[in-house]
Amino acid sequence: MRPAAALSLSVLALSMLCGCASSQEPDRGYRVAVGDPVPEFNLTDLDGRTWSSEGLKGSVYILQFTASWCGVCRKEMPHLEERVWHRFKDDGLQLLGVDLDEPAAKIQSLVDDTGVTYPVCLDPGGALFAEVTVPKAGVTRNGVVDREGNIAFLTRLFDEAEFEAMITAVDTLLEDQ
């Protein structure tokens, strides 16, 4: 076989192998998947209000996992505020920040620094985060939950295309009355 033909076949085989691997959706550090019921939770926000998976049934909502030390979270939160919360809150969307195991003072500082107005809750010991993710998973995540309490969309990090897809998913869920 000529060297050019062998090289072409090698490149083709490698391309096919890489294509197959990338066509499978990785878990990206999640224990849960789209279609699964959201784990049961009871959270308290910085204003002392209680939020629960049971109490939110019948609503479309987002659980936004965050932490004060997370740079990507700090970048994403103003986008959630402007492009999601302001746009959909009057349509019935609930957006809950879920801070990973930090004291209220640190969380309040994060809220003040990022300017968000949606409720941000404490997750003592990272209990809910541990139900949703594998051990040592990164923090920046959003889980969109449908009216039946099932996970409808998951994000990881702040990727513009994925963020736009999440907005579309929220819009669709809110339209489905």
Residues covered by each model-derived region:
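N-terminal "domain-start" segment that seeds a small globular fold
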Residues: 23-53
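Short loop/turn microsegments at loop-to-beta-strand junctions
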Residues: 38-39, 60-61, 139-141
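Thiol/disulfide oxidoreductase modules built on the thioredoxin-like
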Residues: 112-117, 123-171
